Amino acid sequence: MNETQIQRETRQVVEDVLEKTNLKQGVLFVLGLSSSEVLGGQIGKESSQEIGELIVETILGILGSRGIHLAVQGCEHVNRALVVERQVAEQFDLEIVSVHPTLHAGGSGQLAAFKFMQDPVEVEFIKAHAGLDIGDTAIGMHVKHVQVPIRPILREIGHAHVTALASRPKLIGGARAHYPQDAIRKS
């Protein structure tokens, strides 16, 4: 698998999702990543630390330049806990849990987050404003309501299927209520 191509595809998809979601500085963005799927394998079966590092480092750079906080979701072996910076956990009052990821429990993305973040910790649950799912890892439990599917510019990174979610405020009030337009809500 060509690492330059994976990095280029990752950059394209993340920048496209950020443009479509119009995220503001200071919000949370969740990443679900199967390096096995990126390489054309089955999720959890052919994990690659190198691919995890390539993708997470690329995404951290893009989000960091915009002041958006990355949360990297682990697999079910760590109950889909997430790696964030300690400062983010404290700022959002997230519950820190005791686990250190491995390649096959947490996954390559979490290992990469531990490598590239300044002071990484694992947290049990977040409510992100948006997220990217590389390889059908199921990020929905960590994206706030109301979730809106986003179609990224590319459908795959490497061989992995790619989807994205954004969120919008709930519409309440009924027939007489009026709602402001937003870029995410469908007509």
Curated annotation (Swiss-Prot):
Gene3D superfamilies: Hypothetical protein TT1679 (3.40.50.10360). It comes from the Bacteria. Pfam families: DUF436 (PF04260). InterPro entries: Antibiotic_NAT-like, DUF436. NCBIfam families: TIGR01440 family protein (TIGR01440). Belongs to the UPF0340 family. This is UPF0340 protein SPH_0758. It comes from Streptococcus pneumoniae (strain Hungary19A-6).
